[in-house]
Amino acid sequence: MAGEEVKEIDEFEELGFEPATEETPKKKKKEKIIRSIEDLPGVGPATAEKLREAGYDTLEAIAVASPIELKEVAGISEGTALKIIQAARKAANLGTFMRADEYLKKRATIGRISTGSKSLDKLLGGGIETQAITEVFGEFGSGKTQLAHTLAVMVQLPPEEGGLNGSVIWIDTENTFRPERIREIAQNRGLDPDEVLKHIYVARAFNSNHQMLLVQQAEDKIKELLNTDRPVKLLIVDSLTSHFRSEYIGRGALAERQQKLAKHLADLHRLANLYDIAVFVTNQVQARPDAFFGDPTRPIGGHILAHSATLRVYLRKGKGGKRIARLIDAPHLPEGEAVFSITEKGIED
């Protein structure tokens, strides 16, 4: 009997198992190391291919996705999607608590793009921030698109001159992008205009669905340039709300419009945070018929946009061709105003 028992144990060990005895306790199963999306639980080759095709090709991209998004693109259950996201967050070290002093150090790594105006830069805490959405709204001719053109040039400067050595993605919804204006600003700031134009990638959006699709496609260009000497550091949407405003008319369409706008803004936030880029959007205004005192204008987009934009700046015309920028909302800055001019250099004091 003893011989048979030894034989059974030997056969057990030949299969690659170690018998658990009092002297040799059972070994704990090693936790799987997750380095790519294929390593995530519930992600097989077919699911991984679907995720990659939809742009979810990194742990970070999956970690900041919603279960409903993954469910739709990968054809999986919402429960499986949630487990995949939770595993990605753990592997990418996202969604965990951080001490405030450590968060302050992280904030110190945020880049800033000069607007070309020292007074406006001061108002914004040093310029347009990466990892944030900056919304500028105002009436026609207030300087929104001029500021966008200036930023598209300034971001290409080295950090010591107010830039980030970066490229630009520009989503144009109103046919207002002008390469001639970019050339003029670049020339008057001592830059090679042809080189500046080479690092601006422009797409015209013809409706709100196309606009949202272009934001998704922008991620491909961001990834393509990520490890080059000119990574994308600025994404401009000029204007953010024009298509949504014209396509969804009346109170009956308001809920659907706001849902789509919220999804659009969530996509922009994800790109800003995931790839350390500055998102700059312009917005239109409308008159408030019930306003009897003060400025009767208000930005389009309602509470959805008000809560989604990190910084909100209101532009208006001043005397003598000057423009006045008022910081309406920012989580870390006080309200205030700055005066600037629009010249052949773009925006300046």
From Swiss-Prot:
Q: Detail which positions bind ATP.
A: G138, E139, F140, G141, S142, G143, K144, T145
Could you mention a single GO BP entry for this protein?
DNA repair
Segments of this protein annotated with the region Disordered = 1-32
> A single Gene Ontology molecular function, please?
ATP-dependent DNA damage sensor activity
Q: One of this protein's Pfam families, by short name? A: Rad51
**Extent of Acidic residues compositional bias:** 7-16
Task: Tell me which UniProt keywords the record has, alphabetically.
Answer: ATP-binding, DNA damage, DNA recombination, DNA-binding, Nucleotide-binding
* The UniProt record lists the keyword Nucleotide-binding: yes
Keyword Chloroplast: yes or no?
Answer: no
Write down the HAMAP family for this protein, in alphabetical order: RadA_arch
- Give the record's family classification: Belongs to the eukaryotic RecA-like protein family.
Which PANTHER family would you find in this protein's record? MEIOTIC RECOMBINATION PROTEIN DMC1_LIM15 HOMOLOG, RECA/RAD51/RADA DNA STRAND-PAIRING FAMILY MEMBER
What does the protein in this record do?
Involved in DNA repair and in homologous recombination. Binds and assemble on single-stranded DNA to form a nucleoprotein filament. Hydrolyzes ATP in a ssDNA-dependent manner and promotes DNA strand exchange between homologous DNA molecules.
Q: What protein does this entry describe?
A: DNA repair and recombination protein RadA
Q: Which organism is it from?
A: Pyrococcus furiosus (strain ATCC 43587 / DSM 3638 / JCM 8422 / Vc1)
Its lineage reads: Archaea, Methanobacteriati, Methanobacteriota, Thermococci, Thermococcales
